[in-house]
Amino acid sequence: MFLNCHSHFSFKYGTLSVDKLVAEALRHKIDALALTDINSSAALFPFIRAAQKAGIHPVVGIDFRNGVQQQYIGLARNQEGLYELNKHLSEHLVEKRPFGYKAPSFSHSLIIYPFSEKVFPLEAHEYIGISPSQLSALRSSPWARKKEKLVLLQPVSFSSKLEFNAHRLLRSMDLNTLLSKLPMQEQAAPSEHFYSYAEMIARCEHHSYLLINAQKLLEQCQFSFYFQAIKNKRDLLGSGGEDFDYLRQQTYQGAQNRYPKLSQKVRERIEKELELIEQKGFVSYFLINYDLVNYAQHRNFYHVGRGSGANSVVAYCLGITDVDPMELDLYFERFINLYRENPPDFDIDFSWTDRDEVIAYLFKKYQKRNDAHVALLGSYSTFQYKSVLRELGKVFGLPKMEIESLLHHANQEGYRPDTYGKLILTYAKVLHDMPSHLTIHACGILLSHKSIYYYTATDLPPKGFPVTHIDMHIAEDIGLHKFDVLSQRGLGHIKSTLETIYQNQGIEVNIREVEKFKKDPKVKSLLRNGHTMGAFYVESPAMRMLLAKMKVDTYLELVAASSIIRPGVARSGMMREYILRHRNPECRNQAHPVMAEIMPETYGIMV
């Protein structure tokens, strides 16, 4: 009977977190309910997790509304049903089209229309929802003769009087109006909360069929989902075997360039990594990143591969990263191992002038016509304490001066606010950390094997690329691992600098020749003397002084210097001890033998 529950992902409407929604259902001894957020599919999978853990049968759907005017509710009977609902919602959000009064003819979803006097033909999967407050009107309605098509509809949007008041404040904020001027039709009824079964039976004493029909609808919806399976794009070449063969081929081809004398040690490391990559199901993840940097190189875009992916020899051979893990003895298992639950991490930086074209390439290559397989990863802005205080001050009609005074004194001991100040401080705590609106993750992109609509709806911000309703944490939980495509202005400056050198000197500089730079005597001299102004990451006065003090002229020493200057290392005394042992070899004997064996490059000091 609870076919229309809202979480706080019904932005500026619902007040319940997913966990609190489930906890309230348990408190009222409810064994099945449907989460149907307003024009949002953000919380569906966390709800499934939480409900199943609590022993509650979860049903998922969407409440389709124009503003707050409910048009119909869609419930997914299965995963195909969720696909239908997400696609339908996405099409309307992207095209900014209002929903009609009639839903499409879905094959795997159930539709519930709000009760009205207007009578229209219903398809087999369509029903009319009757709230307890509408029972008296039902008696004289033509719908009363169609009992088999009527279900009890008890919406849930909050759990207490306090949260109902918070809901009204959210509605006022959404409409940018004073609380005293909030129209009744723009807010929920005070009764939109859970009732026990006994209470609902009492409220529908002469209409028990409504409860029975609602229960039958919940039983029709059996949404099974395997969270652990990887949902990313796979079988790029037709099958997993072909993908793996291609990854192996390209890795060894790149190894010929990276390691002109390919040793047995390097071969063993490559084979070990390839085996783990295949076992964990990350072959396509590597191939898509490889495709990405290949396209960038073809377009003469500079990139930098970062993250724990820099520990991979396979990534180094493919050109995704430019750091040699063999030379630096980097630990691949930090990136991928059989027991690591988190997905692998490649952070690929491009120039701010090139990033949008790289993203557009991913959409053009991997998006399918009339369906979505690529989307930018969504994120959520949340209400923060000070911003909520300001918004609530406006809703209560306080002058700007009083709002600023409240902000200034809010956390001061002994502060005694007036009546409105007390209300604002109380409800600021209630609203704090609630999601406010959908935003875009800084760099994440999702590429799914099945349509993205099996997992989420999408919206279309001014950026021009579709954005998911799920965030990074939900995506990882359901097996969709993001690709990180970042923007860095420094790469743009490097490119323009190299163009200037070529114009003025006629010299072409290849910045990917890392080994050449490591051995360049001029580079070593600049580092030794701390002449690094204009060099990213090592140009601060403290860093330049440290480079000169240590006489740094190797890559490992540069890495150590950039580590020991961090506040934690510096405050612990390890920075001072490292410099002492670096400049005075006889002091290195002070290191504990075990520490010296584990960390010989840093003289037994953890940096």
Give the predicted meaning of each segment.
Residues 2-607:
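Alpha-helical scaffold/interaction cores of sigma-54-like transcription cofactors
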